[in-house]
A protein has these predicted regions:
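Short beta-strand edge/turn micro-motifs at domain boundaries
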Residues: 106-137
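Short, well-ordered beta-strand segments in beta-rich or mixed alpha/beta enzyme
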Residues: 15, 30-32, 38-41, 85-95
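Hydrophobic/aromatic beta-strand elements that line small-molecule binding cavities or substrate pockets
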Residues: 59, 73-78, 91-93, 107-114, ...
Length: 152
């Protein structure tokens, strides 16, 4: 079964809609076997290792801790290599955790997907929100290494 760039794009749009509408069953179907990096924790996430039930509980807990959560796709590019879909781009998350101030994150993402008998599956993903300056580059003020103090 051959996949197209357009099908990969529609799968990513469906993923975005599922997160925006809190459609836990669609998220679970697409991500239960995924592994990757999110922008909140530093450590790698492995949904397959926690199992479908464990991931379902994580999703339910995540949404229950939010006053609101919205995700809007901003930019999307896709490619297909054999039976593997690749997607990358940016989306915006607007959310407020209960008891905390509202937040807005412009997220860069990459996804590796495949289409099987149960629909689209995200295999690998990476999301980050590293700050960028007005010129679209990472601010050097965040990466400059301070000189070591002089030995006394």
């Amino acid at each position: 079964m051959s996949i197209t760039k357009e099908e990969v794009a529609e799968a990513v749009r469906a993923w975005c809609r599922a997160w925006d509408t809190h459609d836990v069953s669609t998220i679970l179907a697409m991500e239960a076997q995924a592994s990757g990096f999110g922008f909140r924790p530093f450590a790698r996430r492995d949904q397959a290792a926690v199992g479908e039930r464990g991931y379902l509980q994580m999703l339910e807990r995540f949404f229950s801790e939010m006053e609101y959560f919205h995700l809007r796709l901003e930019d999307l590019q896709t490619a297909v290599i054999g039976e593997v879909g690749c997607a990358w781009g940016r989306h915006v998350e607007e959310f407020q955790e209960k008891g905390r101030p509202p937040e807005r994150a412009r997220v860069r993402f990459t996804k590796v997907l495949t289409k099987g008998t149960h629909g689209w599956q995200v295999l690998l993903y990476h999301r980050d929100i590293q700050p960028f300056g007005d010129d679209g580059r990472y601010p050097r003020s965040l990466t400059i290494v301070s000189p070591a103090p002089a030995a006394t």
